[in-house]
Amino acid sequence: MGERKFNVRVYGVCLLNGKVLVTDEFIKGKEITKFPGGGLEFGEGTIDGLKREFVEEAGQEVKILRHFYTTDFFVPSAFDPESQVISIYYLVEFLSEPAFPVKEKCFELADRTKDSFAFRWVPLSEIEEDDLTFPIDKRVAGLLRTM
């Protein structure tokens, strides 16, 4: 048995004009739909980590509005069964008008020979738990439906 560890993730729930932002990603040969964000780096706080993720992925800065949800059940990592995922979600908004490319359909990825991703806006009234890949994102989608 390998070393068991925690994997802390931070994600932004970005709502704009009645839609929520998701990313369609091709990672390690798998199609994944999730909320924007990613892993915390050592020495980073959750808010700074989320801001960094948005600059890296979208090329834009976000404002953190408030905490939305933190994982409250056990979830092993999809990529490392010896790792427990703890995800923290914040409601965010862009500091300027979104200027990154957005796709209309799921998995309109330019290159499937390497890890890649694309942003997509989903109407909040249409978001379903099954639209997202990971169990924690599914929980957040369910919470969004009750807003």
What are these regions (language model features)?
Residues 51, 70-73, 85:
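Internal catalytic or translocation cores that form aromatic/hydrophobic pockets or channels
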Residues 75-104:
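Active-site-adjacent beta-strand/loop module that shapes the phosphate/pyrophosphate-binding cleft
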Residues 2-6, 32, 80-86, 111-116:
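A generic structural micro-feature
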Residues 30-33, 99-101, 105-147:
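Nudix hydrolase/Nudix homology domain
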Residues 16-19, 26, 93-98, 124-126:
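Short loop segments at secondary-structure junctions
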Residues 16-56:
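Conserved Nudix-box catalytic region and its N-terminal flanking loop in Nudix hydrolases
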Residues 1-21, 39, 91:
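Conserved N-terminal beta-strand and adjoining loop/helix that marks the start
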Residues 61-70:
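A short coil-to-beta-strand element that immediately follows conserved catalytic motifs
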